[in-house]
Amino acid sequence: MTVEFAEKAKKEFLKLDTPIQKQIQNFIVKLQGMKNPRSTGKALVRNLAGRWRYRVGDYRLVCEIEDEKILVTVLHIAHRREVYK
């Protein structure tokens, strides 16, 4: 499985503190080793329907999953109180 970051997510990632970046990097490595990326995520609803979120500490990764390409694209990374705004 491949995990990619959208430009916005890359910028958000680089703004995070180093320990949080390492937490997210460790999660991405685990995610790449999974057969089913939906097993640890949660489907989003309403205006974010069709996207998935992953919880990494107090941060959330909003992603799109493309089954035919076996690709997870990270669209947005933010603190849990800000991620859905």
Where are these regions (language model features)?
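Positively charged, low-complexity intrinsically disordered regions
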Residues: K22, S39, Y54, R81-E82
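Conserved short hydrophobic interaction patches
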Residues: F27-K30, R80
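Flexible interhelical turns and helix-capping residues at alpha-helix boundaries
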Residues: F13, D17-I20, W52
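N-terminal non-globular leader segments, chiefly Sec-dependent signal peptides
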Residues: I20-Q23, M34
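A short, surface-exposed loop/turn module that caps and links secondary-structure elements
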Residues: V29-R53
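Enriched for short, Lys/Arg-rich terminal
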Residues: T2-K11, K15, V56-Y59, E64-K85
